[in-house]
Swiss-Prot record:
It holds the Pfam family MukE. Keywords: Cell cycle, Cell division, Chromosome partition, Cytoplasm, DNA condensation. Involved in chromosome condensation, segregation and cell cycle progression. May participate in facilitating chromosome segregation by condensation DNA from both sides of a centrally located replisome during cell division. Probably acts via its interaction with MukB and MukF. Interacts, and probably forms a ternary complex, with MukF and MukB. The complex formation is stimulated by calcium or magnesium. Belongs to the MukE family. It comes from Haemophilus ducreyi (strain 35000HP / ATCC 700724). It comes from the Bacteria. GO terms for cellular component: cytoplasm; nucleoid. It is found in: Cytoplasm, Nucleoid. CDD domains: MukE. One of its GO terms (biological process) is DNA replication. The gene is mukE. This is Chromosome partition protein MukE. InterPro entries: MukE_C, MukE_N, Scp_MukE.
């Protein structure tokens, strides 16, 4: 039996699976997490065993992707055997704004640290406020309560993006400050085309193109099903 297993599994893949890093890393990838170079051990592990793990994940109908910026993630195919869920329009839009901030001069000026308020203010700056408020509440009158609900939605989107490695919290446990990972370019595939990156992001956000059905399909980030945890986090935040 042991000989059969050794014959069926390439030696280097067997070494990868036996590594103590693998179980937790595998769970993170399946839950939609992006593994950037800041995660030193996990990233080095994926670099060492990239070819073998690409073959391993293909069996589940998902692709292990290494983006041009160097981060890794799993991209499910339509026939995937791993449960998945797509991002909401608000999460996609907040991701686009984060990419815009990542490319901004302010990132260097602020030592790469942003806050939830920065994202909210930039979103109102770049997008049509009335459309945003209507998206949250179709009967919006532009009241302070409507704006509070929008801010709450932005906070929820940031929590989801933190969980998948797009941003990393800094400071105290409940801090609303964070740094943006290069994995934010999951939301900026279109900025690699050669045009000015900030201008491309700005156009997408201002013209309402950041969450079109086409972009939601082609750039969708998908997750393992963890809705129960989302609801718990949202209830704790209220």
């Amino acid at each position: 039996m042991t000989e059969y297993i050794q014959d069926a599994i390439p030696a280097k893949l067997a070494i990868a699976i036996a590594n103590p890093i693998f179980p937790q890393l595998d769970s993170q990838l399946r839950a939609g997490r992006h593994i950037s170079i800041e995660m030193l051990d996990e990233h080095a592990f994926l670099m060492d065993f990239q070819t073998e793990l690409e073959s391993f994940y293909r069996r589940y109908h998902v692709d292990l992707i290494r983006a041009p910026e160097g981060f890794f993630y799993l991209r499910p195919k339509a026939s995937t055997l791993i449960a998945r869920s797509a991002m909401s329009e608000m999460e996609m839009l907040v991701g686009k704004v984060l990419c815009y901030l990542y490319l901004s001069p302010e990132r260097l000026a602020q030592q790469g640290i942003f806050s939830q308020d920065d994202v909210y203010e930039e979103l109102l700056n770049l997008a049509d406020e009335n459309k945003l408020l209507k998206a949250v509440n179709p009967r919006s009158t532009g009241s302070d309560l409507d704006r509070a609900k929008l801010a709450e939605k932005v906070g929820g989107a940031l929590r989801r993006l933190a969980r998948i490695g797009i941003i990393t919290r800094v400071g105290e446990q409940n801090s609303k400050k964070f740094i943006i990972s290069e994995a934010v370019f999951r939301f900026g595939a279109d900025v690699r085309a050669g045009d000015d990156p900030r201008e491309v992001q700005l156009r997408l956000i201002r013209d309402g193109e950041a969450t079109t059905p086409t972009l939601l399909t082609t750039e969708a980030i998908e997750f393992a099903e963890d809705g129960a945890r989302d609801e718990l986090e949202e209830s704790e935040a209220e």
